[in-house]
Every structure is written in C-alpha cells, then in structure tokens.
Amino acid sequence: MVAIPNIKIKFGPQGSVRTFQTLSDSSKKIEHVVTEDLSQSSEKSKKRGGPKELDEVQPKKKQRLDCDWSSQCLALLRFLMEHRGGWLFKEPVDPVKMEIPDYFNVIQKPMDLGTVKSKLLKNVYSNADEFAADVRLTFANAMHYNPLWNEVHTIAKEINEIFEVRWESLMKKKVLRLSWNEVREGYKRQPVERDCSRRSSTGTSASSGVGLTKPAKENSEKGSLSSKPVKVQSKKNTPAVTPKALATCKCGRIICICLKSCSSFGSDVCSLTDCQLKNISGAQASELDPQSNGSDTSKKERNGSLKSQLDKPSNSDLLGNELKTAFPALPPVPPEKALRAAILKAQYAGTIIKAKHRIVLGQNNKADLIRIQIEKEQMERAQREEKARIEAEMRAAKVAERMRAQDELKQKRESQRLEIAKMKKGFDFERNNHSKLKKKFVKVCGCFSLTKARLLLEELGLVLKNDYCPELEVIGSEKFDAMRMDDLEEGEIL
C-alpha cells in the first residue's frame, strides 16, 4: 500500500479537479484511477437524469374543487332536481325498462343528474366548468333524443334555461369575490407608514430643532427606510420628542404603521391618500434637510401647492357621499328581537370582551384582569339599561295597541248604531201602522167606502191606478159578464 499525501478533489460541472503534490509513478497511477472513477460516476448520473428530470417525470397533483364552490354547485343541483320535471333526470336512462333499444346508438355519452351528484360528493371535478358541462350534457341528450313536441324535450329545455340563468349569476359572484380578494391581498403587501401624532405648534418646533442637529447621513437613511414597506422601527432611529408632542399621540408612539383595509370600491381612495401622505412626508423631509438647495419662496410655493391639494374635494369624500345615498337605511328591528339580542349580549359579556382584545389573559397579570373586569361591568350595566329601555318600549307599544283596539271597537259600534238609526228612520212601524192609516183616511174622507173615496179624489184632481184598487177591477169584471149575458142566445153556454 502506498499512502497518498495531501490529495484535494474539487467537484465541478465539467468533472473533478485534482490538486496535490508531485508524487511518484505509483501515486500517479492511483491518481489516474481515481479520476477515471469520478468521471464514470458523473457520466452515469448525467445519463440517469438530474433532479429536474425527476420532477418532470413525477405526475402533478390533480386540482380539486374547493368546498365553497362544491356546496354552491350542490345547492344548484338540488334545486334542479326538485323541479316539477326534475325526477326524469335523477337516474340513468334504462333502455330495457323504457323500451327504447336505440338509445345508446343515438346518445354516445349518457349523463344524468344523479351521476353528477355522486361525482360532486366524491370530489371528482377539478373545476366548476366540468360540473356545468355534465349538467348541460344531461339536458342536451334529452333534447337530442326526444322530438320537439315531446313533453320531455320541453321540460329539459325549461330546466336548462333555469340552470343557465343561475349559473351566470354564480359566475358573476365568483368574479366579484376574486377581484375583491386580489385587491385586498395586493394592498396588504404595501403597508403605509403614517404619522399618528398630530403635534401642536410647540411640539413641532421642538421636534424640528432636534431633527436639525442630526447629520445628513441619518436623514438619507430615514428616506431610504421610509420608501420601503417598514413594519417595525428600532428605538435608536426614533428622535427625542417633548412630553407635549407625546401627549398628542393616541397610541403612545410617535410613528405607527396603519394598515388600512381597502374595500372593492375603495381602492382608488387608498391610492389617493397614499400619494398625498408621500408628498407631505417628502416636503417635510426637504424642509428639515439643512443641505437642501432652495430659497424660502420655493418652500412657500411647495406648501401652497400641498394645501391646495388637500383643500380639493378628494375621491374619498365623493365616494362616501355616494355610499350614503346608494344604500338605503336598514328597517327597524322588532322589539322582541332587540330584547333577545340585549339578553344574549349581557349573558356573554366576558366572551365578547375577550374576543375584542384577542388575547388569553393569565392569572398573574392583575392589571389586565382588573381592567377587563371593569369593562365587563360597564358592558353589563349598559346591557341592563338597554334591556330596561326595550322592555319599557314594549310595554308602551302594548298599551298603545290596546288603546287602538278600544278606539276601533268604539268606532265600529258607533257605525252600527248609525246604520240602525237610518234603517228605523226609513221605515217606522209605528207611523206606518194599518189601523192608524185607516182612521186618518176616515177622518179626511168621512167614510171608508172606495167609491166615495174615488169620487172625492177625482174632484181633487187625483186618480188612483187600477193596480192600487183591486176592488174596482172586480166591479169592472162583473159589469163585463153582465153585458155578455145580455148578448147570449138561448141554448148558448157561457
């Protein structure tokens, strides 16, 4: 055995590179053998293929339909199956049972709603378009096999139209949801650094004095940091500020990062406010920079342009006014539901407070426990007051309803009384009594004989009709019979 001193082998893309001291012939032979082995192993690895080739050979994982879309598709499918003619498409077509032996000759790809439902439950579909294609194929087969005058053809056409309308509405909702998610995610990637402390005149003078003492290097570093999306600032870079300036900040810090959640129709507002904030911060940095080349007039012009930009009505105000006018006011909540909500809020006050703070409090932190207890008591007190107010409103509503019912009953009784009075006035039984009328007639005419009464009335210029005097008709008929008796001959029968 021959020892090989200080051998160094480096592996590269072209093979192995050797660096070692000059050796004897035997050591050179060993070197040649080692290099040949390394070259052979590299060639074999190239023939077998690298990790990229292995990745290409491995099959990609098939995508599946997400839960939200599958639930919406399942609800739409159930709606179609519950249609008055949906039972025709629930099961696959049986040519033997329906006595249609040529069905599979006409229809090459049979499909039904039951099969679509089973595939949907087994999560076979990779996207929603496959589901829609199977549903359309079901109704297309029915319309293709059955003629136009067949009832199955008309029902399939009707259900297919319903499906197309509902599917179009689902696709519109999906597009709106995707656009909203993209806007929200894109805005979350660009957090905006905003100055939360609105300093007073004294605070601004103190902070500007401190900033002027710092070198230009720190100002350049601050400018580079402000241009990038910063999430946390170190304590070394924060300038010293007077207590008055600190008191004006609500969150207790000089600069905080506010991530504004941007809605689907508020993205323009967000971009506009970001540009205004960047312009203001750039103007302040240029004013604080001691090495900036510019006169006082240029600074005044810049400040005037900034003020004019801020004084102009922004798109946020316009959009806010549009939103106020576009959405109508919500209807008032019934007292029963409001009382139920107040009771539930009072019952779960502790849970609501924990959810607002989003932390799990420990037993050792007494300050937080006391603060949470105070907030819980305040919430319970507010809920009790709201509950009492709602109960008082309910009692007042019940009293008002009772009074309204009594008023309606009184009005109904009064209307009935007036109707009875009108009916009694229209026909009074006491005044229209037959005996009283007879007595008055005798008193006026002097007798109750119809003949004398008729003569008296004729003298007064009044004539009674035959309808109102049946006795006169009888007398007239008797006269007519007597006249006919005179005209009769012997032996003639009347």
Curated annotation (Swiss-Prot):
Q: Which SUPFAM superfamilies match?
A: Bromodomain
Primary localization: nucleus
Q: Where are the compositionally biased (Basic and acidic residues) regions?
A: 50-61
Q: List, as start-end ranges, the regions of compositional bias called Low complexity.
A: 199-209
Keywords, comma-separated and alphabetical: Bromodomain, Coiled coil, Nucleus, Transcription, Transcription regulation
From start to end residue, where is composition biased (Polar residues)?
A: 286-296, 305-318
Pfam families in the record, alphabetically? Bromodomain
Which CDD domains does the protein's record reference?
Bromo_plant1
User: What sections of the sequence does the record tag as coiled-coil?
Assistant: 366-428
Q: Where is this region: Disordered?
A: 33-61, 191-237, 286-318
Q: Which GO terms describe its cellular component?
A: nucleus
Q: Does the keyword Lyase apply?
A: no
* Classification via SMART domains: BROMO
Q: Where in the cell is it found?
A: Nucleus
Q: Where is the Bromo domain?
A: 64-170
| PROSITE patterns according to UniProt | BROMODOMAIN_2
For this entry, the protein name equals Transcription factor GTE12
Which taxonomic lineage does the organism of this UniProt entry have? Answer: Eukaryota, Viridiplantae, Streptophyta, Embryophyta, Tracheophyta
